[in-house]
Amino acid sequence: MNSITIDNVCIRWLGHAGFFLGWQDIKIYIDPFQINKEPSFDNKADILLITHDHFDHCSPEDIQKVQRSDSTTLIPESCSLEFRGYTRRVVEGDILAEGFEIKGVRIEVLPSYNLNKPYHPRGFGVGYVVELGEIRIYHAGDCDFFPEMKSIRADVSLLPIGGTYTMDEEEAASAVAVISPKVAIPMHYGKLEGTNGNPEKFKTFVQGKNPDIKVIILDS
């Protein structure tokens, strides 16, 4: 399966770090990459979230496939690209709520960085928590297990496990243990060189740390 529905929120893995979130009539895309088929107009993005400007997260070709002329796109300040519709540059710590929500959706902008690798320095990219109804969904972006994760509140966590550029399976499981979501979904593995993480290995590590957390492995 490539999608699950939790409390009326559809979560679909698009492959790599890309996800589609559907709730009521709101369609959200995060880091779309190598999308095979352009969605119908009704399934294009109300909101598009980009975590950083590496080619496998900020792909103009794929963004064009999912965007409408009235889409709202959030990108980190380090990203120099411009897109159709309304583009808002964000930094960690931004909270789009209390009158600044996008189409009724509360979005928190979080740090996302490497601790012991040069690929994603702090301030280069961001993560997001998207609040849809009663569900909080955390997309970590490309990162290691960093200290601020201890304060993240999420019901569903989407975490990279590929190693090399991000956390590996065991580090991601440690992140899951401190975030303590109800559901953890691995991402950023199996598509590109240097993303050789094993989702079953991740699941085993998570279950060893907290068997109450459900790990769901989606097909792209």
Where are these regions (language model features)?
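Core dinuclear metal-dependent hydrolase active-site scaffold
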Residues: 1-43, 91-152, 167, 219-220
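Short glycine-/small-residue-rich Rossmann-like dinucleotide-binding loops
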Residues: 53, 111, 162
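A short acidic, amphipathic alpha-helical/loop segment
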Residues: 61-66, 82-86, 148-151, 171-175
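Short, charged/polar "capping" segments at the starts of alpha-helices
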Residues: 79-84, 193-196
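Divalent metal-coordination and catalytic microenvironments
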Residues: 21, 31, 52, 59, ...
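Short, Asp-centered acidic motifs that coordinate Mg2+ and/or phosphate
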Residues: 27-28, 47, 156, 183
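Cap/insert and terminal regions of metallo-dependent hydrolase folds
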Residues: 74, 144-220
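Active-site metal-binding motif and surrounding structural segment of the metallo-beta-lactamase
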Residues: 34-81, 153-158
